[in-house]
Swiss-Prot record:
Species per Swiss-Prot/TrEMBL record: Pseudomonas aeruginosa (strain ATCC 15692 / DSM 22644 / CIP 104116 / JCM 14847 / LMG 12228 / 1C / PRS 101 / PAO1)
Family designation: Belongs to the purine/pyrimidine phosphoribosyltransferase family. Xpt subfamily.
UniProt record, GO biological process: purine ribonucleoside salvage; xanthine metabolic process; XMP salvage
EC nos: 2.4.2.22
Keyword Membrane carried by entry: no
Main location: cytoplasm
Gene Ontology CC terms: cytoplasm
The organism's taxonomic lineage, starting at the top: Bacteria, Pseudomonadati, Pseudomonadota, Gammaproteobacteria, Pseudomonadales
Cited function: Converts the preformed base xanthine, a product of nucleic acid breakdown, to xanthosine 5'-monophosphate (XMP), so it can be reused for RNA or DNA synthesis.
Gene: xpt
Top EC class, one word: transferase
Stated name of the protein: Xanthine phosphoribosyltransferase
Gene3D superfamilies assigned: 3.40.50.2020
Keyword field contains Glycoprotein: no
Keywords (A to Z) from UniProt: Cytoplasm, Glycosyltransferase, Purine salvage, Transferase
Compartments in which it is found: Cytoplasm
């Protein structure tokens, strides 16, 4: 997706050979027009898959997931990273390790929103080692729902997330595939 790659080149900041900061348009400040195009791109790739729900993780996956949900006409569920007073009973629960934050979190989805009749599209802002995706897949599996695939805004192709997910039979569609962040420069795979 050329417009996304252009945005990454112009506003992304390479913090290290493994960390790309995109808080100017994706995971702190959000560019609504870009997210609308991101949602359209995911909808185009998965429109014929019979999607009934989109699942993401709070917080940075919410904007692209909502835009895809709008395009596909389906609800969006975001896994919460903590339990609150309003989210405490009948939950699907998993653990996720954040590469960027170097912490483990508990995530949860209410069982009343996801069930075995659902066919799910997973959407997230980044794919690196696949930990967040695997945690979401675990939650979806607990519900007995099926997975159409994963839509990733930015994939760090130099890490093993895609290989892990594809080896387990999951379809992965990434809108921007980063080959390298070496030398403070973003190099795309395609």
């Amino acid at each position: 997706m050329d417009i996304l790659k252009d945005k990454i080149r112009s506003e992304g900041i390479v913090l290290s050979e493994h960390v790309l900061k995109v808080d100017a348009f994706l995971n702190h400040q959000i560019d609504p027009q870009l997210m609308q195009q991101v949602g359209h791109a995911f909808a185009t790739r998965f429109r014929d898959q019979g999607i009934t729900k989109i699942v993401t993780i709070e917080a940075s996956g919410i904007a692209p997931a909502v835009m895809a949900g709008l395009e596909l006409g389906v609800p969006v569920i975001f896994a919460r990273k903590y339990q609150s007073l309003t989210l405490k009973d009948n939950l699907y629960i998993s653990k996720v390790f954040s590469f960027t934050k170097q912490t483990e979190s508990t995530i949860a989805i209410s069982a009343k929103h996801l069930n075995a009749h659902d066919h799910v599209l997973v959407i997230d802002d980044f794919l690196a080692n696949g930990h967040a995706a695997k945690a979401l897949i675990d939650l979806i599996g607990q519900a007995g729902a099926s997975i159409a695939g994963l839509g990733i805004v930015i994939e760090k192709s130099f890490q093993d997330g895609r290989a892990l997910l594809e080896s387990e039979g999951y379809r992965v569609e990434s809108l921007a595939r980063v080959k390298s962040l070496a030398g403070g420069q973003v190099e795309f795979l395609d």
